Curated annotation (Swiss-Prot), chain A:
Protein name per the record: General transcription and DNA repair factor IIH subunit TFB4
Family note: Belongs to the TFB4 family.
Zinc finger boundaries on the chain: C4-type: 294-313
Locations listed in the record: Nucleus
Basic and acidic residues bias: start-end ranges: 92-103
Self-association and partners: Component of the 7-subunit TFIIH core complex composed of XPB/SSL2, XPD/RAD3, SSL1, TFB1, TFB2, TFB4 and TFB5, which is active in NER. The core complex associates with the 3-subunit CTD-kinase module TFIIK composed of CCL1, KIN28 and TFB3 to form the 10-subunit holoenzyme (holo-TFIIH) active in transcription.
Disulfide links within the chain: none
Gene designation per UniProt: TFB4
Highest taxon above the source species: Eukaryota
UniProt keywords, alphabetically: DNA damage, DNA repair, Metal-binding, Nucleus, Transcription, Transcription regulation, Zinc, Zinc-finger
Function statement: Component of the general transcription and DNA repair factor IIH (TFIIH) core complex, which is involved in general and transcription-coupled nucleotide excision repair (NER) of damaged DNA and, when complexed to TFIIK, in RNA transcription by RNA polymerase II. In NER, TFIIH acts by opening DNA around the lesion to allow the excision of the damaged oligonucleotide and its replacement by a new DNA fragment. In transcription, TFIIH has an essential role in transcription initiation.
Any GO BP annotation: regulation of DNA-templated transcription
Main location: nucleus
Curated annotation (Swiss-Prot), chain C:
Subcellular location: Nucleus
GO terms for biological process, alphabetical: nucleotide-excision repair; transcription initiation at RNA polymerase II promoter
Name this protein carries in UniProt: General transcription and DNA repair factor IIH subunit TFB2
Keywords: DNA damage, DNA repair, Nucleus, Transcription, Transcription regulation
Subunit structure: Component of the 7-subunit TFIIH core complex composed of XPB/SSL2, XPD/RAD3, SSL1, TFB1, TFB2, TFB4 and TFB5, which is active in NER. The core complex associates with the 3-subunit CTD-kinase module TFIIK composed of CCL1, KIN28 and TFB3 to form the 10-subunit holoenzyme (holo-TFIIH) active in transcription.
One of the record's GO molecular function terms: double-stranded DNA binding
Family indicated by similarity: Belongs to the TFB2 family.
Gene that this sequence comes from: TFB2
């Protein structure tokens, strides 16, 4: 009589060959740091990249009629949600745009209302994203040099996670979420390690895959690779540094990054990450075989710090403990030379 | 508590009253002619009663010189009186010979605070390192208990040449934990709850009784002791127990409610009275009835007050029905406390306080130790081949120019379809597919390189022993002890062992896997020996 | 779209010849709609191929899918092949160029195609709003449903609709009128989206008969699915066939035209949710209620169920709609009716009545869970498992006896003969029942012939050996 059992006590078949058709929410985080784009302008122009991103967004929306998208931009001053816009913002921005478009004669933009060849849903999203993104780019605050090297990836990730949390978990809609990070990266870029790692751990816990598409020569490849690795995301470096080229971005996006979270268990991911999991000293940044570990914050050191304090958590070590670490074995009268 | 009987002495009707507290017997005539007779029960040497078949119903009490005789109207009364007297006399005599313990003995422990009884001197297992290391028996038992540990011990000490003291010196904590757990004994428990009268085949009731149980019972319930002492010289033991287990006294001590259906037993029911339960008497020092007019607190309580609708809970009812229940609960609580005190690790006052129920106090948050972590920005970055970070100045103007130019000449989506890009797209696809193939390839190699379980086992044993030796080596290295050289020798032997184990693997592919698996351990041994050499020379 | 209807549309499309499909793929809207019907792996693969100029190697696809999900890959490839989106050669897979071009156009735009409908650029003098459209859709649709159930609300659907109902087997002609069939009962229990698709598929089937180009019909249907609610569209974008269809669709309440000669039309909610999730759709009566009450916002009313089912089999339905009450009456023994509620009980008789009319237990259970009150939906089990199990058991009761036609073989001369023949029957696999004690057995009709021959051969053998 188990056949008619109304209660669903059986575990789901893990080898379920039929895919669940849940819609998914894609959070795209776009690097809007103009100097970085300027550096790679010979390889790909911003507008080309923007167009590619829009096509990708349309493709994502095409996959399922309830798919939704969230676009966030970040630069040295911070991060901002570009789509969905705050209500009220939309009308003012589009008005601005129309004014601009009237003054500049660009045949492509003006009849946007009259171009009916694109699916309406795509069109509305595209327009808002374009407006907001260009806004962000145009109104970049070019502040002092030192501060230009900060990058607000952690802020952008937090915004994305917050948005996902609200729309998927709090509102309890049946959606899967994922994050795509499109970064260009300045070579002197500095990323706040701990806040970003916290965001990665949060994404890991919520089972949100974080994909990374790297277009430029930014540093911190290792740390972004780690992010993809721990969340089972895809890492692709298509910058010239990696002997590839960001040209053809749209094809990269449509073939590498299009896969839905519900499809991912069934396919091999085209990820390029080879994370080096070896331990590294916090002081010298070299890889460490045998070293010392702080008993409070667990940071690894290859030598005893000269100021007797831990570099990360600032605890002082007592003389006695440090002296004990430096002891050597007693020399015997007869030296036994051991041949390994 | 006193018993009164109608009795006639020398043909004068009177009232015979026996007081348990004062251990006195007093006979007062109804009509005041004769003098009352007072007998101290401790002095009673002989007690006689007329036999069953005799017509007379008389009781003769010999206390000292003069015997007194009392006549009763019916046999039953006489029997009762005789029983009471017997009990009291034997008790009085006993008390006379053994002076009673000081009044502050049992009775003073009130339920609120527990005074810990003197620590029982017991053979305590020493918990310090030295004795643990010397206790071979303990070590043997632990090895037998834990198979894992036994295996490691066999591999390192028996086969590998490690000294047992070395082995245990880093595992003292395991020994200590094991010693503590194996020394735990079961504490005292309410023995009456274990005695369950079972009904036999032909309606006989059987009870299992062992001398230990009897001893426990006397320990926990002094009333039983009293009853036993009073009656057993006279009654047979089996009879006594038989009657005891059927009596209401037994039920009361177990904490069950006494219903009117239970059989009464004149002998046993005497002990039901509160005079035998000193503690209860002391605890119930409050007067029975507090006038409602005065008892403001009692009137106010929500639970007790009937104006709130439902009848109050069984434990909250005023009057005699409430008292029975409450007394039962209280006596059980007292018993539990007594047992806890008797146990071997009595609680200090502070610890006793922690036993109290605290679920109404609200949650205490977790206490975290705050770490002051310095926010250094590029922490965790491994240096690749780049040297220092160089800061090229930022050209804000160029950037603005670039953005504006881009904004004015946007790329439409449709233009992406242009043939110019085809080559790029093809290449992009190729790269993506390459990544997929690479991933798939590495995946497949993982599948193929599974080691044969037997080989794996052997290598694991060798590996564990090596790690053990490495641990000891580093321990000694840091301590600067003299053992270091022998440890260095042992490490050399380890390498030989590893090579031997790997050499034993016949199959080509497995051999390769084995070599790969042991490579990192060998590196660590080499590293250790190098450090040792440097230390020796430098 | 519920998976049932995905499947039926898929089946229909797979049945079309390649040339037709290629013509179908010339409309980006259709490409998009068909794209969304495909399984997930197919969609991912296609996306990777739209901009790629070269065909992809079969080995690439094999490498992409994990070995444990082989079955998925095979199913996907099969489906894509049947729909002529992929053509496979020895080592390569080529995507249908028309499909590729037009799907890309849907994503990228700019080629001035009109498959997504052309909104009107002139103002409508008699503009209507969304609430009106909803009300209109509901009233049209419910008219049809009421007609099927038999409640009289005064209006009858147009002849075209009646024709459709007859041809689809939902109603049958009887004594001058139409009577609902078993299939019709099942139809009533489905949700609106499924109902519309049933009718549309039927329309599609009839269209070939009526010499309407199925490509046009499908294009129009898919275009409707991509239109925006509340926007009026011009007829200039439609072909003749499609204009003709408009009249029929008007009768179903899928589109609204002020009069037959209007140059514009409005899609209703029934149209715009043709290709979307059922969750986004309100049932027809709920829309009507919401429109009349005029208070609840659309998202809230979207999932307002109205049925409460207790574990003692009692049912309380907070509805006043005669349609819903009529539907409930099919399988619930309704006892009392109040101003805003009807109550009743599900018992064996009521469920048997439904079962005898061809409704399955699954349909009843689905209907109940879809229309369950939000309070019920919040619980771990939406419907009490006891009731669900019992409905299924009542259905099983109908199958207590299963009749199979067969031949009875009896009166064997001796036990040996019986044993031989029955063993032979068993080996053939045609033995249905045997009783060795009485030396009888029953075999299937088909197998009886062979057994008779076997017996004849055996008797001959015995006779010859005896002689």
């Amino acid at each position: 009589m188990n056949a008619i059992d109304g209660t669903s006590r059986q575990l789901k078949d893990t080898e379920d060959q039929t895919l669940d058709d849940t819609p998914s929410l894609l959070s795209i985080i776009i690097d809007a740091h103009v100097p970085s784009w300027e550096e790679i302008k010979s390889q790909i122009s911003i507008s080309e990249a923007v167009a590619s991103i829009l096509v990708f967004i349309n493709a994502h929306l095409a996959l399922h009629n309830s798919n939704s998208v969230n676009v966030i931009g970040y630069n040295a001053s911070g991060a901002r949600i570009l789509y969905p816009p705050k209500s009220g913002v939309e009308s003012t921005r589009s008005k601005e745009r129309e004014e601009r478009s009237e003054s500049v004669s660009d045949g492509e933009q003006a009849p946007s209302k009259k171009d009916h060849s694109m699916y309406r849903q795509f069109k509305t999203v595209d327009e808002v994203v374009q407006t907001e993104l260009w806004n962000m780019l145009n109104h970049t605050n070019y502040v002092e040099e030192e501060k230009q090297h900060n990058s607000a990836i952690s802020g952008a990730l937090s915004l994305a996670l917050g948005f996902i949390n609200k729309h998927v978990f709090v509102d309890e809609s049946r959606m899967r979420a994922r994050i795509l990070l499109l970064t260009v990266g300045h070579k002197n870029e500095t990323i706040q390690y701990i806040p970003t790692m916290n965001c990665i751990f949060a994404a890991q816990k919520l089972k949100i895959p974080v994909d990374v598409c790297k277009l430029g020569p930014g540093s911190d490849q290792v740390f972004l690779q780690q992010a993809c690795d721990s969340t089972h995301g895809i890492y692709m470096d298509i910058s010239e540094k990696n002997s590839k080229t960001p040209k053809g971005l749209v094809q990269y996006l449509l073939s590498g990054f299009i896969s839905d979270p519900s499809l991912r268990p069934h396919i091999v991911l085209p990820t390029q990450s080879n994370v080096d999991f070896r331990a590294a000293c916090f002081l010298t940044k070299q890889v460490v075989d045998i070293g010392y570990v702080c008993s409070v914050c667990l940071c690894i050191m290859s030598q005893i710090p000269s100021n007797r304090r831990c570099p990360t958590c600032d605890t002082t070590y007592s003389e006695k403990t440090l002296a004990g670490l430096g002891r050597k074995p007693l020399k015997k009268k007869k030296k036994k030379v051991v041949k390994p | 508590m006193s018993h009164t009987f109608q009795a006639t002495n020398k043909k004068v009707l009177g009232v015979l009253s026996i007081s348990a507290e004062t251990k006195k017997l007093e006979w007062t005539p109804v009509s005041g002619d004769r003098a009352p007779i007072n007998v101290n029960l401790a002095n009673v040497t002989n007690l006689q009663a007329t036999p069953e078949n005799s017509a007379k119903i008389m009781l003769k009490i010999v206390a000292g010189d003069d015997p007194s005789t009392f006549a009763f109207s019916n046999r039953g009364t006489m029997i009762e009186c005789r029983d009471v007297l017997q009990g009291l006399v034997s008790r009085a005599r006993r008390e006379a010979s053994n002076p009673p313990p000081s009044a502050t003995g049992d009775g003073s422990s009130t339920p609120a605070t527990a005074t810990p009884p003197p620590k029982k001197e017991e053979k305590k297992v020493a918990m310090d390192d030295k004795s643990l290391l010397a206790d071979f028996q303990l070590q043997q038992t632990l090895l037998k208990e834990s198979k894992e540990l036994g295996k490691v011990f066999a591999a390192t000490v028996i086969h590998g040449g490690l000294k047992p003291e070395e082995f245990w010196s880093i595992r003292v904590h395991l020994l200590r934990a094991f010693a503590l757990t194996s020394n735990q004994k079961k504490g005292p428990y309410n023995v009456l709850s274990t005695i369950k009268p079972t009904t036999g085949s032909d309606n006989t009731v059987n009870v299992q009784l062992t001398p230990e149980k009897v001893k426990d019972m006397f320990d926990q319930y002094p009333v039983v002791q009293t009853a036993y002492d009073d009656n057993v010289p006279r009654l047979k033991e089996s009879d006594f127990w038989a009657r005891f287990f059927q009596s209401r006294l037994f039920k009361k001590l177990r904490g069950e409610r006494i219903t009117h259906k239970d059989p009464t037993d004149p002998l046993m029911d005497r002990y039901l009275d509160d005079e035998y339960d000193k503690e209860a008497a002391l605890a119930a020092g409050m007067p029975d009835k507090v006038h409602r007019f005065v008892d403001i607190g009692g009137n106010d309580s929500q639970a007790g007050s009937e104006s709130f609708g439902n009848r109050p809970d069984m434990t909250m009812r005023a009057g005699s029905s409430g008292r029975d229940v409450v007394s039962v609960i209280k006596s059980i609580n007292r018993l539990s406390e007594r047992l806890a005190q008797k146990s071997e690790a009595p609680l200090a006052e502070k610890e006793y306080g922690t036993l109290a129920l605290a679920d109404l106090q609200g949650e205490t948050g977790a206490e975290y130790v705050p770490l002051q972590v310095r926010q250094s920005d590029t922490n965790g970055n491994k240096k690749d081949s780049d040297g220092d970070v160089d800061m090229t100045p930022l050209d804000a103007e160029a950037c603005k120019e670039y953005v504006h130019s881009q904004y004015d000449n946007p790329v439409s989506l449709a233009s992406l379809v242009h043939d110019d890009y085809s080559a790029d797209y093809a290449q992009a696809w190729g790269n993506v597919q390459g990544a997929v193939n690479q991933q798939k390839g590495s995946w497949e190699t993982v599948q193929e390189s599974l080691m044969d379980p037997k080989v794996l086992n052997d290598l694991l044993v060798v590996h564990t022993t090596t790690i053990e030796f490495l641990r000891h080596f580093w321990h000694n290295f840091q301590e600067g002890s003299a053992e270091c050289s022998s440890m260095a020798n042992s490490l050399a032997k380890c390498i030989k062992r590893i090579d031997a184990a790997v050499g034993e693997v016949k199959d080509e592919q497995q051999h390769k896997l084995a070599v790969g698996a042991m490579a990192s351990v060998k590196t660590s041994i080499h590293h250790a020996l190098k450090e040792y050499d440097i230390a020796l020379r430098g | 779209m519920t998976s049932q209807f995905k499947n039926s549309i898929n089946d229909y499309l797979e049945g079309l010849p390649e040339a037709v499909l290629t013509r179908l793929y010339q409309s980006p809207a259709t490409c998009l709609a068909v794209f969304r019907l495909l399984p997930a792996l197919a969609r991912t693969l296609i996306m990777g191929m739209i901009f790629n100029p070269d065909p992809i190697a079969v080995a690439d696809v094999d490498a992409l899918v994990k070995p444990s999900s082989q079955r998925l890959k095979l199913e996907t490839q099969k489906k894509l092949r049947l729909l002529h989106i992929f053509t496979e050669t020895q080592a390569h897979i080529i995507i249908n160029p028309t499909f590729k071009k037009n799907l890309r156009a849907a994503l990228v735009g700019g080629d001035q195609n009109i498959s997504f409908g052309v909104p009107c650029d002139t103002e409508d003098k008699h503009k209507v709003d969304v609430a009106f459209l909803d009300a209109h859709a509901v009233s049209q649709w419910e008219m049809i449903l009421h007609f099927m159930v038999g409640t009289s609300i005064g209006r009858t659907p147009s002849d075209g609709v009646l024709n459709l109902l007859k041809h689809s087997g939902l109603m049958e002609p009887e004594r001058g009128g139409l009577r609902i069939t078993n299939a019709g009962f099942q139809f009533l229990l489905q949700d609106v989206n499924a109902q519309i698709w049933t009718l549309l598929l039927q329309y599609l089937n009839m269209s070939e008969y009526l010499q309407m180009d199925p490509v046009d019909v499908l294009n129009f249907i898919f275009m409707l699915g991509s239109l925006e609610l509340g926007q009026d569209y011009s007829l200039s974008a439609l072909s003749e066939t499609q204009k003709h269809m408009l009249e029929d669709l008007r009768d179903y309440g899928i589109v609204y035209q002020r009069k037959a000669s209007s140059r514009r039309f409005y899609p209703t909610r029934l149209a715009t949710t043709l290709t979307s999730e059922t969750a986004a759709l309100r049932t027809a009566s709920q829309s009507m209620e919401a429109a009349t009450q005029d208070t609840i916002s659309s998202s809230v009313a979207a999932d307002s169920g109205f049925i409460i089912l207790e574990t003692n089999f009692r049912l309380y339905a907070y509805t006043e709609s005669p349609l819903q009450i009529a539907v409930l009456n099919l399988f619930v023994n309704l006892k009392t009716r109040f101003a805003n509620m009807v109550t009743g009980q599900i018992n064996r008789d009521s469920v048997r009545f439904a079962l005898s009319n061809g409704i399955t237990a699954e349909q009843i259970i689905t209907y109940l869970s879809v229309h369950a009150h939000p309070r019920m939906k919040g619980m771990e089990h939406v419907l009490p498992p006891t009731v669900v199990d019992q409905i299924k058991l009542w259905q099983l009761e109908m199958d207590r006896i299963r009749a199979t036609d067969g031949y009875l073989f009896s009166e064997f001369k001796n036990f040996d003969e019986y044993k031989d023949v029955s063993t032979y029957a068993k080996e053939l696999g045609v033995l249905l029942y045997e009783n060795p004690g009485k030396r009888k057995f029953v075999s299937t009709l088909a197998g009886s012939q062979q057994i008779v021959e076997f017996v004849k051969r055996r008797n001959q053998k015995h006779r010859s050996s005896a002689n």
